[in-house]
């Protein structure tokens, strides 16, 4: 079955088993790793942690194995000056009965359920807004408690080379290039409390 209930169950299961972690950024001192799909899947499923590009790529693989129609897309966070960071967030859009849902397991906070991508809809404190765009791009602004989180560009990302460039740019980035490069961050979703927590034991 590929319905919203199953999607939510898969999300919650994945989020409670896999830790969002940027620890590799602080541990890898050699050349930045490449985004090789087979290596990423093997590493993520074995180590059970990663950043957005690891986790959401692995989860998209899980979804496809369960028969879901899904694709990867780029999303962008804002700097304090309102401009967008160059390094993008990799996330997932799932199509169920003609409706599009955001299914993000790689943010490390905010998201725990599928969010239907319709203007003005609020799901689990997450609000979707569709800005007035002049270039006919399909854009969704995602907010939490009226605070901007990320802007999604609804265009299937099919190029592994593009993801690889973004992946390597992350590992080359400095503290001023992206907040995630400033300090270690580990979070896992606790279904009992319904929120993200610091893992009791950090995997090595």
UniProtKB/Swiss-Prot annotation:
It is an enzyme of class 2 (transferase). Its EC number is 2.3.1.-. SUPFAM superfamilies: Cysteine proteinases. It comes from the Viruses. One of its GO terms (molecular function) is acetyltransferase activity. Keywords: Acyltransferase, Transferase. Disulfide bonds: none annotated. The active site is at residues 52, 89, 104. Belongs to the arylamine N-acetyltransferase family. This is Uncharacterized acetyltransferase L280. The lineage of its organism: Viruses, Varidnaviria, Bamfordvirae, Nucleocytoviricota, Megaviricetes.
